[in-house]
C-alpha cells in the first residue's frame, strides 16, 4: 500500500511540475502599440575630411507595432532631397528585420551625397529620411520621416605618387 501511495505522490508532483512550466508570456512576440518614430542624431551635419573615419550621422527608430500578431516587422529607409517627395530616393536599408539604426562615417556619407545627390564641396543639402515599416501578412504600412541637412566636402585624390 505504501508503494502505491508513493507512486501516486510522485505522479502528482510530476504533473504539478509540468504544469508550472507553461509559458504564457507573449510580450516578446507582441511589439505592442508603439508608434514608429525615426530620429536623427544631428539635424545639421558639416562634413570634414580630416575626420573621415568619425561617425557623421546615425538614424535610429523605434520598433513600431506588429498589431499584436507576433509577425516580423521589416524596415526600409530612404533618403531624398527635401521637397522631392521621394521620387529619386537613395535606399539606405531595404527590408531589414530587427535592425533599428543606420550609421555612416563622414567619408561614407560624403560619398553618398556626391554620388547620389550630386553635392559639391561646401554645398549644404537639405535631406529627408523616410522609414517604412511593413508587418508580414498585413497591408498596413507605418511611416515616419525626419529632416536634416548635410554640407559635403571635396575629397583629396586617393591616388598617391
Per-segment meaning from a language model:
Residues 74-78:
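Beta-strand signatures of extracellular beta-sandwich domains
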Residues 26-59, 63-73, 85, 99-128, ...:
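Insoluble glucan recognition modules
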Residues 1-9:
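Bacterial N-terminal signal peptides that target proteins for export
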Residues 64, 79-80:
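Intrinsically disordered, low-complexity boundary segments flanking structured domains
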Residues 16-20:
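C-terminal motif of bacterial Sec signal peptides marking the signal peptidase cleavage site
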Residues 23:
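Positively charged, phosphate-engaging catalytic surfaces used for nucleic-acid and nucleotide handling
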Residues 83-94:
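Surface-exposed loop/edge segments in extracytoplasmic proteins
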Amino acid at each position: 500500500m505504501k508503494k502505491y501511495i508513493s507512486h501516486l505522490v510522485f505522479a502528482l508532483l510530476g504533473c504539478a511540475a509540468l504544469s508550472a512550466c507553461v509559458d504564457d508570456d507573449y510580450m516578446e512576440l507582441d511589439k505592442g502599440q508603439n508608434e514608429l518614430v525615426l530620429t536623427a542624431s544631428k539635424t545639421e551635419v558639416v562634413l570634414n575630411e580630416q575626420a573621415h573615419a568619425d561617425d557623421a550621422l546615425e538614424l535610429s527608430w523605434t520598433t513600431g507595432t506588429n498589431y499584436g500578431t507576433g509577425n516580423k516587422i521589416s524596415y526600409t529607409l530612404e533618403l531624398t532631397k527635401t521637397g522631392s517627395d521621394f521620387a529619386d530616393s537613395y535606399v539606405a536599408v531595404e527590408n531589414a528585420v530587427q535592425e533599428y539604426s543606420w550609421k555612416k562615417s563622414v567619408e561614407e556619407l560624403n560619398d553618398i551625397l556626391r554620388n547620389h545627390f550630386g553635392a559639391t564641396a561646401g554645398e549644404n543639402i537639405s535631406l529627408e529620411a523616410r522609414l517604412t515599416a511593413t508587418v508580414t501578412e498585413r497591408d498596413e504600412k507605418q511611416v515616419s520621416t525626419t529632416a536634416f541637412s548635410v554640407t559635403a566636402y571635396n575629397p583629396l585624390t586617393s591616388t598617391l605618387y
